[in-house]
């Protein structure tokens, strides 16, 4: 059984791609780079059959295969059942201490679609995006596949405000499930 996933539909905000372009230039140069992933159980890979099947590792593996001259460090700071409120309290130690060049943030399933979680998510995004090492940031919006519920609406507003690239599983993968 094959899936017909239209990846273009997943781009909900292209944002300012300056840092992404810089990331790709650095990756082509063959230096050392750190890729970090911050989120809940989806990022952690808790339901993956093996850790190499979780999205975070697959993204890391794509970079390794695409840029073989570059030595990549993989930082998976996914902790199941946690929200952006907990994420903002641990981001410095679990992510920023590694001086990441690229950070994916994913809390759309565990956060509620409320103003409170929009504030905690914004605090997290500001901490990462405003870091002195200026990492490229990608916001990933997942969804409860059984109900279609997520905090994507509130999180997308933050991504648009800071002009950050954002992708959504709702119009792509969720549409196929």
Which residues does each predicted region cover?
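N-terminal secretory targeting modules
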Residues: 1-37, 43-50, 64-70, 177
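Alpha-helical cap/lid subdomain in secreted, periplasmic
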Residues: 25, 31, 54-177
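Structural cue for short, hydrophobic secondary-structure segments
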Residues: 37-38, 106
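A secondary-structure boundary/capping signal
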Residues: 38-39, 169
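A short, flexible beta-alpha/helix-coil linker loop
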Residues: 41-44, 109-111
